[in-house]
Amino acid sequence: MGLGLSLAKPSQEILVLDGDGGLLMNLGSLVTISNADPKNFIHIVFDDGVYYTTGSQPISGKDKYDFKSIAIGSGIEQSYSFDDLEIFSAEFELLLNEDGPIFISLKIEHKKTLMDAWVGNTKEHSRKIKKYLEGNKLLLLFINF
């Protein structure tokens, strides 16, 4: 959906927020994105090593793959991986000025109590996040998050 939106709205920056489990289930999307080559497309994957939306089960083999390498292998040359939030914040401002597609893997710590706060409230929490981010120049699209 994010790719289609970026192709339909080429003058609008499109930011897709994704989970690592969701991307693993749809790896072919990276090749499709690379082939379409949208200049206004940024794909951020939150890599916490669990299938979040199905109960935070650990992802099998989570230490054996590297999303940045997978994205590069799929043809997305501008692929980055961050495990430090401060460095990511500084670099992200610079990346916003680059042509896409841009792929970013952001390693985050999975908080075991996080899922409990979301159970039954996903729609409400997503609404709050969207409201918080409104006014940003980026069009936000939540996929598999």
Language-model-derived ranges and their functions:
Residues 97-145:
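Glycine/aspartate-rich loop-and-adjacent alpha/beta segment that forms the canonical ThDP
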